[in-house]
């Protein structure tokens, strides 16, 4: 059995693990509240139903068809205990640990706060534009807060499109590679103000009590009016207590955003939790010019908000803070030196809000989640709408779109048995297609992206070939 044959995307019951500044956010939020009464089909937007219109703007569903399945009866330890330190691309997980979205739809969540891109495009000065781009980069990972379910691994050739006229963008993504798993995406402003694109290769590892996801791949944002391109890589995400205890998530690592035209750079440090949880969710950084002079300081939490201030005021505040910390210094935790064991890591207690330095400028604030989000996989309002299938959509979508994937649809509807059966069928179909290609010595041909080099960094990337929205889908593969 070769490397391809060893990889599983769909096995019965299992799944592999490659797997506000000067602008208001109020008009950017998806309207509505979650309602668990699934009989109210006109409100939740069940499969095949057309959302209503309000003032000419399409209203999207505000709930999933069924609440999430309980994970309390499943133990991940029996699966992961032999995998410490290993990459998880070939390790199967119970489907109960998934969420009813494809990874391609998860990537689309970058666009929830797309108003920050529109804002950047309208700002006259490069420093102001970088502030908004930095806020967008942080907001792009905010949806991962408390999202402990794993998205479904995309099948080779799977696609996802999203057009949001109310938010001013359209988006297309494709699973372009299976080994390694690579997802490519391209988005553009409907007013031709930006291009946003990249390719993501998520690398997952298990470290005993946690799973670490390193999102390899370059993210590129082009502001067309200013002839500017910004590139960066997302921080590492870690899910703690995957064996026992309450699951919790942190992001850590350094993100560098470079303006390739002006030389401005934003350096953002996503802080690891640290002792006593003092640094949990914190983001700190600065914007510098091409001569490395600090122009603007940034601070906040990726789960909450982002603020900025001039360097002099920031350093003055930090000096006072350090003096206070020295006076209040606590003794070390008595248990901090004990060996790692099967004891859960206590969920750190974070401060409720960010301490705002006087004179600071609000760059971004997270959208409030629906009241019953916890029963909907901790989805945001934007996320809840991603898999809705409206009347007539099947006639315009390619047959490879995630919305048409039956295992994800089954899980969304609360039918776990059907979801597992369909996963098994889809995986076997994918394996058979690989065997046929191997027999015929045929290479897989992507449809909407092609391999190349990023035009700004020179690193390997997948580039959009164009023409998707011409909607000629006659040569799309039958993957479902």
Swiss-Prot record:
A GO cellular component annotation in the UniProt record: presynaptic active zone cytoplasmic component
Alphabetical list of PROSITE patterns matching this protein: OSBP (PS01013)
Annotated consequence of substituting residue 215 to A: No effect on phosphatidylinositide binding, but decreased cholesterol binding, plus decreased cholesterol and phosphatidylinositide transport
Residues that hold a 1,2-diacyl-sn-glycero-3-phospho-(1D-myo-inositol-4,5-bisphosphate) according to the record: 90, 178-179, 427-431
Hydrolase listed as a keyword: no
Pfam families for this protein: Oxysterol_BP (PF01237)
Effect annotated for changing residue 79 to A: No effect on phosphatidylinositide binding, but impaired tetramerization and decreased cholesterol binding, plus decreased cholesterol and phosphatidylinositide transport
Membrane topology, record value: Peripheral membrane protein
Family: Belongs to the OSBP family.
Stated role: Intracellular transport protein that binds sterols and phospholipids and mediates lipid transport between intracellular compartments. Increases plasma membrane cholesterol levels and decreases phosphatidylinositol-4,5-bisphosphate levels in the cell membrane. Binds phosphoinositides, such as phosphatidylinositol-4,5-bisphosphate. Exhibits strong binding to phosphatidic acid and weak binding to phosphatidylinositol 3-phosphate. Binds cholesterol, dehydroergosterol, 22(R)-hydroxycholesterol and 25-hydroxycholesterol (in vitro).
Summary of subunit composition and partner proteins: Monomer. Homotetramer; phosphatidylinositol-4,5-bisphosphate binding promotes formation of stable tetramers. Interacts with DIAPH1.
Disease cited in the entry: Deafness, autosomal dominant, 67: A form of non-syndromic sensorineural hearing loss. Sensorineural deafness results from damage to the neural receptors of the inner ear, the nerve pathways to the brain, or the area of the brain that receives sound information.
Protein's name in the database: Oxysterol-binding protein-related protein 2
Organism encoding this protein: Homo sapiens (Human)
